Amino acid sequence: MRVNKSLTPQDLMAYGINDVQDIVYNPSYDLLFQEELDPNLKGYERGVLTNLGAVAVDTGVFTGRSPKDKYIVRDDTTRDTFWWADKGKGKNDNKPLSPETWQHLKGLVTNQLSGKRLFVVDAFCGANADTRLSVRFITEVAWQAHFVKNMFIRPTDEELVDFEPDFIVMNGAKCTNPQWKEQGLNSENFVAFNLTERMQLIGGTWYGGEMKKGMFSMMNYLLPLKGIASMHCSANVGEKGDVAVFFGLSGTGKTTLSTDPKRRLIGDDEHGWDDDGVFNFEGGCYAKTIKLSKEAEPEIYNAIRRDALLENVTVREDGTIDFDDGSKTENTRVSYPIYHIDNIVKPVSKAGHATKVIFLTADAFGVLPPVSRLTADQTQYHFLSGFTAKLAGTERGITEPTPTFSACFGAAFLSLHPTQYAEVLVKRMQAAGAQAYLVNTGWNGTGKRISIKDTRAIIDAILNGSLDNAETFTLPMFNLAIPTELPGVDTKILDPRNTYASSEQWQEKAETLAKLFIDNFDKYTDTPAGAALVEAGPKL
């Protein structure tokens, strides 16, 4: 069998990259390990070996995505379909870019990559062969090649024989755009997409997550237009084949809660839902490591070994890691191939239709209950609201928990109007007879975060059906159905009012939060379907 290892400099000339010295094509993990630790490397290119066997790298100034530097070329392909930042009521990061400015940025990146020794990784985004993207990543930095090898689906030798990329990602992290002011851009850094050319360009930021979330944004454009749900969620499957999906923004518990020794992991962040069921977009996991401990999260801790890649953690002189140190960023991370988790769906990361849909929120106000069972209209309302507290460090400039509303629990990655995702999800849920729940992994009136132990017991009660059979009462103002008791959960925390010195204190905070919900949802009331959902939200 002949594997296409003969990618040549001529192949890269088609993208505008010239005079390439050498191409390291689909490097092995062993080769990447050597490359990352090369003592001749300088600055952010150079990795450090930790006592756990994983290499740690520093992503520079950018320790999270830079949404203000995200652009989409507005042309005939995207003009009438994309959810644009400069149109309508919704707030998003999809800023339009002219084809002329795109060509300038492309010239900067191709000039940066020309004449260099390059790493090229061919991989898939999407576990379903019918709808996956074949993506070619081009970078001059070994650890960035390692990151995409971890995070995307690694092709077999057979699949590489006739691999033809649908999408090209050119990472020019070392170059910046000096003409940004004249071009009306946000800064010298850029993360730009062209749907006509099927290409992503990166300049100025070293953060690996831009490649991961960039391809997620593209799947979020392509799949819903085919009637396939594209979801910012984790997913797992039980022994009886029962599938659960966990929606939530960064830091709300998607990775932690879906990594469950009693269930097999489908994936931890990005999934589709088609006629056959739920499938992963990725071939790896990207877990937060701040305050990580072997006791609280053994599966994730044990996944940090050779071939895992740590980002922005503090490594002591003896190679040990201080997971409690957030001085560089609270958004410390590790990427690892999904098979570093023992209990995964094999050989392909997909399963049947979901019957449990869990919305994770981290409520900084301490108003919402740890768990509530949603009606069909409440499901749509809370999906479109996407409320959480924005947690420290996943974006630049955010260091304290602040409340935020992110449509579909992932507005930063949406390419179409949020209602299109809600419509597709609801159709899939109705066909599967799925039930939705709102789970608060954040804070309560004590000012303490709800414990992982209690949250895990709540998830168990959802998955084993005991929550559906529990007696419930209704929380005023938010009209949420709350169980009176659940196995293994401290009954006192189920009603958030009980965690305050007085119910008046809860009432005061609840009114503040309810008003935020109502004001946020106003942007959906310009359609009859959106206006009809107002009744499912909080009432003052």
UniProtKB/Swiss-Prot annotation:
Q: Looking at the keywords, is Metal-binding present?
A: yes
InterPro entries associated with the record:
PEP_carboxykinase_ATP, PEP_carboxykinase_C, PEP_carboxykinase_N, PEPCK_ATP_CS
Q: Where found in the cell?
A: Cytoplasm
Where N6-acetyllysine occurs, residue numbers?
K87, K523
Keyword annotations: Acetylation, ATP-binding, Cytoplasm, Decarboxylase, Gluconeogenesis, Lyase, Manganese, Metal-binding, Nucleotide-binding
Annotated GO MF terms: ATP binding; metal ion binding; phosphoenolpyruvate carboxykinase (ATP) activity
Describe, as the record does, how this protein assembles with itself and its partners.
Answer: Monomer.
Q: Which NCBIfam families match?
A: pckA, PRK09344.1-1, PRK09344.1-2, PRK09344.1-3
Name recorded for this polypeptide: Phosphoenolpyruvate carboxykinase (ATP)
Q: Which organism's genome codes for this protein?
A: Escherichia fergusonii (strain ATCC 35469 / DSM 13698 / CCUG 18766 / IAM 14443 / JCM 21226 / LMG 7866 / NBRC 102419 / NCTC 12128 / CDC 0568-73)
